[in-house]
Regions:
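N-terminal, polar/charged subdomain of small-to-medium soluble alpha/beta proteins
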Residues: 1-104
Length: 104
């Protein structure tokens, strides 16, 4: 599973943060490891320099072989909170998608 972490110009994306988020993705999505080919994480601040509640956004896209990508988005006060909310959403979406695949 290839993991890509992307940030916009308003979120400082240093290597320690990228490593941390990559490890969290690996840990949280381990049970889907054989199904997922790539995960993309996009972190951003929708208000830029201005302060706003829930203006940090995390979009996670999971790509599976021969399937359409699954994408989820979460907003929160901090990039970390948005990330964890998006991880929970993508886990639920992947579980639902794989359950439907098994039923057919």
């Amino acid at each position: 599973m290839l993991i890509q972490i992307n940030t916009d110009k308003n979120i400082e994306g240093h290597s320690r943060m990228n490593e941390f988020f990559s490890e969290e993705i690996k840990k949280e999505l381990a049970r889907f490891d054989d199904k997922i080919t790539r995960i993309e994480v996009h972190l951003g601040d929708e208000n830029g320099d201005k302060f706003g509640k829930h203006d940090k956004k995390c979009m996670i896209e999971a790509r599976m072989e021969k399937k359409n990508p699954i994408a989820v988005t979460a907003h929160s006060d901090t990039p970390e909170k948005a990330f964890y909310e998006a991880v929970e959403k993508i886990k639920r979406s992947l579980s639902t998608t794989l359950e439907k695949m098994r039923e057919h």
